[in-house]
Amino acid sequence: SEMCIRDRPPSVEQIDDFLAEDSPEVREQVVDHLLNSPRYGEHWARQWLDLARYADSNGFQADQLRDSWAYRDWVIEAMNADLPFDQFTIEQLAGDLLPEPSPDQRIATGFHRTSTCNVEAGVHPEENRVNQVFDRVNTTGLTWLGATLECAQCHSHKYDPISQEEYYQFFAFFNNTPLEVENKS
């Protein structure tokens, strides 16, 4: 149970305690304890944040830090609170568009701000912004549709579910987003 829920093996002491317990409900008690642990949310949030391409920095050579920890913490809290998946989705894709959104619902839209961001000298701001939109489209497609959309960026393919035209319709939806970070030359 420990490996499945928290992604780490139980300690020797925990194994000994489990084996020494005579109650038939011991397994259920252990699972309930693990599910109520903050580490449960951390473990499953890590899986989600990998899909959302979360990072604490921009990468590239400049590798500037990002203030995206609030989004990471929101995902952990959502996992620990067992937020229903439909609400989890709505708040990340459009939390700021809900009627009277709470600060947490606005933070959830940090999903859109985890795209690649190159702020090195010489990078054209509009090219950077468009690359962020492409990344947002591709990540949203992979995360919620379970489909890689990158091929449709260049061409339609008879085996892919998304045509090039549909890809750019999706792109148009996200293409009203301002540049995340200005270039610092």
Task: Map each language-model feature to its residues.
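Short, structured secondary-structure elements
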Residues: 1-2, 6-185
